[in-house]
């Protein structure tokens, strides 16, 4: 095509993801196209399993485990409260988490059990810094959810997942499935508790660090469930956990690729190829040791979608940030210091810098290039920001937050790189070196301005008096602070754009006060100035200020040139 671009063109739609999420939430509230129902404390939560699976690793495992998962459309769970599940569902569909002093503990516990890293991190930080302090927030207030209630809920969640993961065709007795009836023998539960306790102790002691929890091959290479589980004390339910327990949430990896009918959609037995689904699971398997432990309080996700985290975090970030700013105005200095740490934490977390610690390395390889060109919309001014991690920095322009403080002079900055440059004033560091004269500078722009001393470049010119300047701020000061009287300077440079003023006849000489026309199309710089200055210098020293205006440091800088052409700083 003549005059066109040959090749694909990527056209981003920044509002597309939020529009899709809004549409799904509207369907949920109206009960449209919901393919699964979650029962908690007698309440029904119709929802879309794809949305829950994208937000929660636990629901993803639950909805893609078992041979009859396509026919399972009702799940009754008792290890989370209805109020906590309501808040988490609203978070999944609206990207906004609503917490209060009364429910922050329940939401934290539910987020840990359901493996929602973003929510668990934020709630844990709120409790740790006592931003939402309560008299009694339950066992969730203990470090890493180590309370007895959380341990019981963790056990129940694990049993429920194992019940659906186990293949009902392996001829196991009904007592092997604790969730098939609440009357399971105590011996099985004791063995379960011992296995969990051993795994927890191994993680706490650091014995699991570096082990290959997933074996030498991907999940697709492992035998299906039931091929050799009959010899265990709890067949098909609890494999060996002392050495093979994965650190990411104490949940085992998938033991087999999904069946051909296991497509995760209600009421549809798809005929997809097993190889494609096995390859998808193989890509979703985390690298050994990349996922932090469930009880460590870190995120438990194994294959979290980093791009979705950025999209979900914007409104939550703004809500928490504005709350912290409001509290900072009424608190003392120490409290404001703590609030600064909270703000810093949120900005770093939602900027994407945390993903190297939360998500395994495999999820970054294919997303780094995409994230570098990501578009995000500011929730305040709706300006589209290009570049991953730049949205939190832009939001600071609205909130006035300056999270980075100099520990010497207490000056605060909005960006960490600005603080790093500021610290050079205290340390005396001057990393930028002139290759011609050896002068050192603390700032890159100072070196750039200094190099104009050697090159003679003065790119900034006053349109009224034709005076030229090395730096733009000097020209601005000349126009605003000093005031330009419009009289051409005796030592001003030649006009770089306008040429001879239009009121001067062609062929006539330059009017008094204006410099002569350039010779051979070249402008005069330091050499001509030195000759003029030597004639006018009262002491005959031959030294001049290359600023172009005697005693006006705004027209040049600290550089000085001698009559012999040697420059010094």
Swiss-Prot record:
It is found in: Nucleus. The keyword Cell cycle does not apply. There is a cross-link at residues 430, 527 (Glycyl lysine isopeptide (Lys-Gly) (interchain with G-Cter in SUMO2)). Residues 343-569 are annotated as: Mediates interaction with RELA. The gene is Zbtb7a. This is Zinc finger and BTB domain-containing protein 7A. Residues 371-569 are annotated as: Mediates interaction with SMAD4. One of its GO terms (molecular function) is nuclear androgen receptor binding. Transcription factor that represses the transcription of a wide range of genes involved in cell proliferation and differentiation. Directly and specifically binds to the consensus sequence 5'-[GA][CA]GACCCCCCCCC-3' and represses transcription both by regulating the organization of chromatin and through the direct recruitment of transcription factors to gene regulatory regions. Negatively regulates SMAD4 transcriptional activity in the TGF-beta signaling pathway through these two mechanisms. One of its GO terms (cellular component) is cytoplasm. It comes from the Eukaryota. Keywords: Developmental protein, Differentiation, DNA damage, DNA repair, DNA-binding, Isopeptide bond, Metal-binding, Nucleus, Phosphoprotein, Repeat, Repressor, Transcription, Transcription regulation, Ubl conjugation, Zinc, Zinc-finger. Residues 214-304, 480-569 are annotated as: Disordered. One of its GO terms (biological process) is negative regulation of transforming growth factor beta receptor signaling pathway. Widely expressed. In normal thymus, expressed in medullary epithelial cells and Hassle's corpuscles (at protein level). In the spleen, mainly expressed in the white pulp germinal centers (at protein level). Up-regulated in thymic lymphomas. A zinc finger (C2H2-type) spans 376-398, 404-426, 432-454, 460-484. The lineage of its organism: Eukaryota, Metazoa, Chordata, Craniata, Vertebrata. Residues 34-101 form the BTB domain. Sumoylated. Undergoes sumoylation with SUMO1 that may regulate its transcriptional activity. It comes from Mus musculus (Mouse). Residues 275-569 are annotated as: Mediates interaction with KHDRBS1. InterPro entries: BTB/POZ_dom (IPR000210), SKP1/BTB/POZ_sf (IPR011333), Znf_C2H2_sf (IPR036236), Znf_C2H2_type (IPR013087), ZnFinger_BTB_dom_contain (IPR050457). Residues 548-557 have a biased composition (Gly residues). CDD domains: BTB_POZ_ZBTB7A. Disulfide bonds: none annotated. SUPFAM superfamilies: beta-beta-alpha zinc fingers (SSF57667), POZ domain (SSF54695). Disruption phenotype: Death around 16.5 dpc because of severe anemia with a profound block in early B-cell development. Conditional knockout in erythroid cells, leads to the expression of fetal globin in peripheral blood of adult mice and inefficient erythroid terminal differentiation. The keyword Acetylation does not apply.
